């Protein structure tokens, strides 16, 4: 699948959509590559040089958090989240479109609420002054990705609602239209 950062949304919303797409792609690519390099370097260090990298596990933990929460936004952008669509699929197109707007707005609201609670949690962690044992980084710093991921995911769902309100088709995300890519998927 070729990744494009262009948006079908007009004006500022299109720029926001494109910016989020670029951020997601960069964070995911950087996170996966750094995790692979760190793991390989740790294995080589352990078996060839006889010493592990002392901060390897902590770095991978940070990268897992980054990849997870950048990944939820990426999945929303590409309409790859699990959907319970048994009732939805039976509805006529007009009702499906309205339902998609409601689903997108409600999901965005929950994502923004989770962003708020994650930010509050980070505040409580910051006040405790805990640090990672090996890297000596404050614990709250590695959790920054949690509200950032929830915020980007909420923005994706909000932009999906806007896309459905401003376009004639039914969109599962800002650029993924409802339907089957392959006619064979319809056969049972």
From Swiss-Prot:
Tagged with keyword Transmembrane: yes
Q: Where are the transmembrane segments?
A: 25-45, 52-72, 99-119, 131-151
Q: Which Gene Ontology molecular-function terms are recorded?
A: transmembrane transporter activity
Instruction: Enumerate the UniProt keywords alphabetically.
Output: Cell inner membrane, Cell membrane, Membrane, Transmembrane, Transmembrane helix, Transport
Q: How does it sit in the membrane?
A: Multi-pass membrane protein
Q: Name one GO cellular component term.
A: plasma membrane
Per UniProt, subcellular location reads as: Cell inner membrane
State the InterPro entries in the record: DctQ, TRAP_DctQ
Q: Which GO terms describe its biological process?
A: C4-dicarboxylate transport
Name the principal localization, coarsely classed.
membrane
Report the sequence similarity comment from the record.
Belongs to the TRAP transporter small permease family.
The record describes the protein's role as:
Part of the tripartite ATP-independent periplasmic (TRAP) transport system UehABC, which imports both ectoine and 5-hydroxyectoine as nutrients, and not as osmoprotectants.
Q: What else is known?
A: Transport is enhanced in cells that are grown in the presence of ectoine, but not by high-salinity media.
Quote the subunit structure annotation.
Answer: The complex comprises the extracytoplasmic solute receptor protein UehA, and the two transmembrane proteins UehB and UehC.
Give the protein name, as stated in the record.
Answer: Ectoine/5-hydroxyectoine TRAP transporter small permease protein UehB
> Which gene name belongs to this protein?
uehB
């Amino acid at each position: 699948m070729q990744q494009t950062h262009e948006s079908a949304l007009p004006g500022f919303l299109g720029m926001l959509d494109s910016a989020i797409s670029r951020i997601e792609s960069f964070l995911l690519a950087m996170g996966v590559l750094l995790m692979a390099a760190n793991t390989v370097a740790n294995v080589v260090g352990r078996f060839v040089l006889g010493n592990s990298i002392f901060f390897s596990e902590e770095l991978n933990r940070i990268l897992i958090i980054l990849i997870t929460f950048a990944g939820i936004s990426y999945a929303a952008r590409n309409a790859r989240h699990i959907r319970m669509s048994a009732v939805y699929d039976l509805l006529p197109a007009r009702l499906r479109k309205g339902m998609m707007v409601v689903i997108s707005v409600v999901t965005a609201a929950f994502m923004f609420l989770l962003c708020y609670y994650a930010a509050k949690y980070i505040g409580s962690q910051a006040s405790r002054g805990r640090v990672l044992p090996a890297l000596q980084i404050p614990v709250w710093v590695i959790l920054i990705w949690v509200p950032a991921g929830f915020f980007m995911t909420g923005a994706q769902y909000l932009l999906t609602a806007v896309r459905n309100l401003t376009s004639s088709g039914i969109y599962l995300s800002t650029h993924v239209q409802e339907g089957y890519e392959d006619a064979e998927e319809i056969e049972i």
